[in-house]
From Swiss-Prot:
Organism: Schizosaccharomyces pombe (strain 972 / ATCC 24843)
Protein name (record): Uncharacterized GTP-binding protein C9.07c
Residues holding GTP: 70-77, 116-120, 247-250
Key word Nucleotide-binding present: yes
Alphabetized NCBIfam families for the sequence: small_GTP
Alphabetized GO MF terms: GTP binding; GTPase activity
Length: 366
């Protein structure tokens, strides 16, 4: 009986030899859906073991987690030491790091957990090496550093992207704005608020058929692709920001550096020499979307020594109160805010007010 990996190979081979045109679009849609279902079997943990595997998953600390992903010996361990002071064994041979090595970076008043993950190899998503355990941990991170050696082929970048995508990780993307609601009867009802230029009704119905969805309301609020629809139907995708950390720039020319500096979402560094580490930290902070909020007791000056750290999208005054202590919300009367989120200093606000980075807040209790 064919294994899941063999079935995946068969579907991929059939897709590769199928010419893409209007006549084959429906068939390709069904093949993509079938492929996604097979890959789900690799993503979903099988019974018995569970977890990320011995030495892979670690207890979480801090307000956010950054995971290092890359091929062996690209400089992840050296970068870990530069950022956190945690010494992850580093050497000039491959597979130095065999387990997840955690460290903590203190930055802008926040504790950020850094995970140096073992190097992955091509085919990780299909179970080769320790790839499955490594990528399982990466799925839980708030930000991924894809560490690349600039002396190695830049094709490594695409290989790693494909490994992560094959495991349900979507890099630097927002979830597609597709509303899917399954129902008991009535057939497939499709609506769209924008023109659909990448997908047609037959493809949509073919994909639904592959998932045995006979009745559903599907509302497209973006110009989606067939892959976007499959991601929504699968329901197990994670959308994680990623930075491409281009290491060992001390070994290339200025002209070569100028070329790689054009790569989107990239920061060139030299881990051994500590070059550009400060810019990497600043960019990391921006990508984590963290919000620092300072407390100001009534009648006193603001306390800038220890900010309350919130996340963009979860930074209301109510979130601020809950972060300090769960009892504050029940005693809350109103708050005064100074900073970018208000039109004038000391504005009186309620629980639903959204705070911005470096706001100052005074809570008034009943």
């Amino acid at each position: 009986m064919a294994t899941t990996a063999q079935k995946i190979k068969e579907v991929e081979d059939e897709m590769a030899k199928t010419q893409k045109n209007k006549a084959t679009a429906k068939h390709l849609g069904m093949l993509k859906a079938k492929l996604a279902k097979l890959k789900r079997e690799l993503i979903t943990p099988t019974g018995g073991g569970g977890g990320g595997g011995l030495g892979f998953d670690v207890a979480r600390t801090g307000i956010g987690t950054v995971g290092f992903i890359g091929f062996p010996s690209v400089g992840k361990s050296t970068l870990m030491t530069q950022l956190t002071g945690t010494r992850s064994e580093a050497a000039a041979y491959e597979f130095t790091t065999l387990t997840t090595v955690p460290g903590v970076l203190q930055y802008n008043g926040a504790k950020i957990q850094i995970l140096d993950l073992p190097g992955i190899i091509e085919g990780a998503k299909d179970g080769r090496g320790r790839g499955k355990q490594v990528i399982t941990v990466a799925r839980t991170c708030n930000l991924i550093f894809i560490v690349l050696d600039v002396l190695k082929p830049m094709s490594h970048k695409r290989i790693i992207e494909e490994e992560l995508e094959g495991f349900g990780i979507r890099l630097n993307k927002e979830p597609p704005n597709i509303v899917f609601k399954k129902k008991e009867r009535g057939g497939i009802n499709i609506t769209n608020t924008v023109p659909l230029t990448h997908i047609d009704l037959d493809e949509i119905r073919a994909v639904c058929s592959e998932y045995r969805v006979n009745s559903a309301d599907i509302a497209f609020r973006c110009d989606a692709t067939i892959d976007d629809l499959i991601d929504v139907l699968e329901g197990n995708r994670v959308y994680i920001p990623a930075l491409y950390v281009l290491n060992k720039i001390d070994s290339i020319s200025i002209e070569e550096l100028d070329l790689i500096d054009r790569i989107p979402n990239a920061v060139p560094i030299c881990g051994n020499r500590g070059w550009n580490i400060d810019e990497l930290k600043e960019t990391m902070w921006d990508y984590l979307n963290l919000v620092r909020v300072y407390t100001r007791p009534r009648g006193l000056e603001p306390d800038y020594s220890e900010p309350v750290i919130l996340r963009t999208g979860h930074s209301t005054v109510e979130d601020f109160c809950n972060n300090i202590h769960s009892s504050i919300k029940s005693q809350f009367k109103h708050a005064y805010v100074w900073g970018k989120s208000v039109p004038y200093p000391g504005m009186r606000v309620g629980l639903s007010h959204v705070l911005l980075d470096e706001d100052v807040v005074t809570i008034v209790k009943k």
